[in-house]
Curated annotation (Swiss-Prot):
Assembly description: Monomer.
Taxon lineage: Bacteria, Bacillati, Bacillota, Bacilli, Bacillales
Keywords in alphabetical order: Amino-acid biosynthesis, ATP-binding, Diaminopimelate biosynthesis, Kinase, Lysine biosynthesis, Nucleotide-binding, Repeat, Transferase
Pathway listed: Amino-acid biosynthesis; L-lysine biosynthesis via DAP pathway; (S)-tetrahydrodipicolinate from L-aspartate: step 1/4; Amino-acid biosynthesis; L-methionine biosynthesis via de novo pathway; L-homoserine from L-aspartate: step 1/3; Amino-acid biosynthesis; L-threonine biosynthesis; L-threonine from L-aspartate: step 1/5
Tagged with keyword Coiled coil: no
Domain of life, per lineage: Bacteria
Full protein name: Aspartokinase 3
Amino acid sequence: MKVVKFGGSSLASGAQLDKVFHIVTSDPARKAVVVSAPGKHYAEDTKVTDLLIACAEQYLATGSAPELAEAVVERYALIANELQLGQSIIEKIRDDLFTLLEGDKSNPEQYLDAVKASGEDNNAKLIAAYFRYKGVKAEYVNPKDAGLFVTNEPGNAQVLPESYQNLYRLRERDGLIIFPGFFGFSKDGDVITFSRSGSDITGSILANGLQADLYENFTDVDAVYSVNPSFVENPKEISELTYREMRELSYAGFSVFHDEALIPAFRAGIPVQIKNTNNPSAEGTRVVSKRDNTNGPVVGIASDTGFCSIYISKYLMNREIGFGRRALQILEEHGLTYEHVPSGIDDMTIILRQGQMDAATERSVIKRIEEDLHADEVIVEHHLALIMVVGEAMRHNVGTTARAAKALSEAQVNIEMINQGSSEVSMMFGVKEAEERKAVQALYQEFFAGVLIS
């Protein structure tokens, strides 16, 4: 059995949905289909999820958003008309959407989640209707009826363990299962969404619950590339990588696959195949527990911007019990999460995403560190990019760090910080945002130029 997930770009038009139909029906093993909301039909288009967010926010502010709501309905209507479906499905989507928008707004976060989730929910209903119209037995399955229960954390739901046993019962159903991605239900019966792009997570949860043999994730690229294609022309494709490698790359800016989505599949030992809806015959990228490390130490290079660092210096810091814990506790008390903590004997650097810390919070954090920890020096540096060099084979290859540092030096990129995880799956380099592209290109040239990568 295979669980198949299609992203928004694969479902943005009737023509795309017809491709999905042929992909699903070409393989009898594909029994469960997880769908996103319609994405962009063309470059200047707006994703349905973004329309719904704007619609919900305007309803919360003014109690009305007729133009935005009709724009959402129109996206579904265009798809339905392309597929020659009747108007009844569109009228149902319109009625359900307006009922939802005019519903209870006493909890704005939960209201926003319910409206956002309707993008996937209505698309699943439309897709199930299309499959039936084409003569295929297909059933829309509501996550609540299937028993997909999650924590009550709007916008950041975590699956509850009992869900997997509930979902296993879906194996008993005949025909195709069409399942909306991105959300589950709290035990109180409220719609709660995963983090953005959370349909990947739903697919992985469903694959785990159904004990699938394979989780296929269809998107709009032929494979996972070894580097961002906007930085390097015609980068190498990766045919196989491990869960840990994919997690590191997804975290650091690879947008092909949601980093949280690997966890349910990983725990069940289910391989993940990333494929292209527009070129389904391409082999794609397979994510597995273990792979042969025969093609060099590095499998991919990823980068992301929008970071800042808090540098803390104090003489004899290493002799002070609990210093690091107390520093991180100050961040916790300000509602801040951190990414990395490289350290020395008399200093430590806390790296975090700068978007979560405004000027007032920054001043408060600095003051607390100076007063509570009696730090000799506290310096905050903004506009940093983190570059991750990833590969399971790095632990078995001497000199990988030296090669990376030398490549950056020769490209005249100043390394602001460097950190290597204890697992040795990745190395992190911090550079100025303005030097991100140059740094990534230099590292790609060092590790991939002229080398066959798989």
